[in-house]
């Protein structure tokens, strides 16, 4: 687990729990998505690590975000600025998104294929994964020409390697 994730998780969990309590999960998702995009900017990253006081850094970030932050979002920014943790805002958003997907019973599934998949193939994979995971799935498809043929399916819990490259690797291991 990366250090950023370790630092970001408590902030994301607190924000998520607060959002659920306030019935504002979607609003918080949008707020954190915006803040994360702002924090990814190279100039903003340099500013966040500057020697300015935490109050000035927080006030500047809040003014940049403007209407995209409500009072609670501003409080999160102030707290993270006090603790000099504003640079992990993108990781906080990623962790929040994971909590939100878990809450909404959505599993994120990586599908890596040798060739681009058509709609029928992605529908079949989605249906099979929904059945196996007993939840809705969100497919993230990508192409890797080095697979030769087939697909690799990844979730947080397991990997299914149905690629020709994977089969060749397993065969090579058996022969050794």
Swiss-Prot record:
Function field: F(1)F(0) ATP synthase produces ATP from ADP in the presence of a proton or sodium gradient. F-type ATPases consist of two structural domains, F(1) containing the extramembraneous catalytic core and F(0) containing the membrane proton channel, linked together by a central stalk and a peripheral stalk. During catalysis, ATP synthesis in the catalytic domain of F(1) is coupled via a rotary mechanism of the central stalk subunits to proton translocation. This protein is part of the stalk that links CF(0) to CF(1). It either transmits conformational changes from CF(0) to CF(1) or is implicated in proton conduction.
Molecular function GO terms recorded: proton-transporting ATP synthase activity, rotational mechanism
Record keywords, A-Z: ATP synthesis, Cell inner membrane, Cell membrane, CF(1), Hydrogen ion transport, Ion transport, Membrane, Transport
One CC-aspect GO term: plasma membrane
SUPFAM superfamilies linked: N-terminal domain of the delta subunit of the F1F0-ATP synthase
Top-level taxon of the source organism: Bacteria
Matches recorded under NCBIfam families: ATP_synt_delta (TIGR01145), PRK05758.2-2 (NF004402), PRK05758.2-5 (NF004404)
Record's protein name: ATP synthase subunit delta
Major subcellular site: membrane
Cell membrane recorded as keyword: yes
A matching Pfam family: OSCP
Subcellular localization: Cell inner membrane
Subunit structure: F-type ATPases have 2 components, F(1) - the catalytic core - and F(0) - the membrane proton channel. F(1) has five subunits: alpha(3), beta(3), gamma(1), delta(1), epsilon(1). F(0) has three main subunits: a(1), b(2) and c(10-14). The alpha and beta chains form an alternating ring which encloses part of the gamma chain. F(1) is attached to F(0) by a central stalk formed by the gamma and epsilon chains, while a peripheral stalk is formed by the delta and b chains.
Protein family according to the UniProt entry: Belongs to the ATPase delta chain family.
Membrane topology note: Peripheral membrane protein
Native source organism of the sequence: Actinobacillus succinogenes (strain ATCC 55618 / DSM 22257 / CCUG 43843 / 130Z)
